[in-house]
């Protein structure tokens, strides 16, 4: 974005405003609005560069309208005795209005006709010079946000830094006063200073015996745990061996097979009886 401070000449008089309008353009309003929305609010020189490299076909037409608006603004500034460049102007407004629609038709089969709508549009672009307020706002925006944020943090951090420097200085003074009082009390009463090393020494001498007893107790407990584990491993196979063998019950024969066999035996008996009766006869 081109800054207004780097322009060729800055206006000291009133703000210069100019516009350019293209009427009855054969570009549809929807396609023209896609291009116009991209340059609205941009500086005039940046808007021209953007329109130069846009892939849309409407960008060439909008470029011509913007160039005409810039030329109109330069003429207005010349009347006031000022000089303006594209860097000194900004696209303040840009919009597209819908023009009349030309209705045509396309003949189709069996006497039918399809309607054709040829839409037109009116493209309008307004430009104006940078006012003094806009220049100050632009210079503020030119400063990166990180620098302003760092300045704000450093300004707010000064009281905290002073407090941090004061507190460490106060703590050592209090500590030194307490040590002086303790030393004075120790010099006044000698017995407390003599008794504390003895107590510490007795505690130091007692600790090895206690640690030895604890280690012995721990070793005995580990030995007991090992013996119990061995006993459990030995008793487990014996218990498995003592278990009696489980006999599975024999599978019962199905009732259907038994019935079939009974029927067959009855049939054999009836045949034998019939043969016996025939022999006797």
Curated annotation (Swiss-Prot):
Task: List the InterPro entries.
Answer: Ribosomal_uL22, Ribosomal_uL22_bac/chlpt-type, Ribosomal_uL22_bac/org-type, Ribosomal_uL22_CS, Ribosomal_uL22_sf
A molecular-function term among this protein's GO annotations: structural constituent of ribosome
Locations of Basic residues compositional bias?
139-153
Q: Where is this region: Unknown?
A: 226-281
Stretches for region Disordered: 137-175, 199-281
GO biological-process terms attached to the record: translation
Specify one Pfam family.
Ribosomal_L22
State the residue spans of region: Large ribosomal subunit protein uL22.
Answer: 1-225
- Please give an example of a GO cellular component term from this record: cytosolic large ribosomal subunit
Q: What family is this protein classified in? A: Belongs to the universal ribosomal protein uL22 family.
On assembly, the entry states: Part of the 50S ribosomal subunit.
Protein name per the record: Large ribosomal subunit protein uL22
Instruction: Report which gene this protein is encoded by.
Output: rplV
């Amino acid at each position: 974005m081109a800054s207004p401070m780097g322009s060729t000449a800055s206006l000291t008089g009133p703000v210069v405003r100019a516009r350019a309008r293209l009427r009855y353009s054969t570009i549809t309003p929807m396609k023209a609005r896609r291009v116009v929305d991209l340059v609205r609010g941009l500086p005039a020189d940046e808007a021209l560069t953007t329109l130069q490299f846009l892939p849309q076909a409407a960008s060439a037409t909008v470029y011509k309208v913007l160039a005409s608006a810039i030329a109109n603004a330069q003429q207005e500034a010349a009347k006031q005795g000022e000089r303006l460049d594209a860097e000194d102007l900004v696209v303040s407004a840009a919009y597209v209005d819908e023009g009349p629609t030309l209705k045509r038709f396309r003949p189709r089969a069996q006497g039918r006709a399809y309607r054709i709508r040829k839409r037109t549009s009116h493209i309008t672009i307004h430009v104006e010079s940078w006012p003094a307020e806009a220049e100050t706002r632009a210079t503020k925006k030119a400063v990166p946000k990180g620098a302003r944020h760092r300045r704000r943090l450093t300004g707010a951090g000064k009281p905290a830094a002073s407090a941090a420097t004061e507190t460490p200085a106060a703590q050592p003074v209090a500590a030194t006063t307490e040590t002086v009082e303790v030393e004075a009390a120790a010099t006044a009463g000698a017995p407390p200073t003599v008794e504390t090393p003895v107590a510490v020494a007795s505690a130091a001498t007692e600790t090895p015996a206690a640690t030895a007893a604890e280690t012995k107790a721990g070793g005995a407990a580990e030995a007991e745990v090992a013996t119990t584990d061995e006993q459990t491993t030995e008793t487990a196979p014996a218990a498995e061996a003592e278990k009696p063998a489980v006999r599975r019950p024999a599978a019962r024969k199905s009732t259907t097979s038994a019935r079939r066999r009974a029927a067959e035996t009855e049939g054999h008996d009836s045949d034998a009886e019939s043969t016996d009766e025939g022999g006797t006869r």
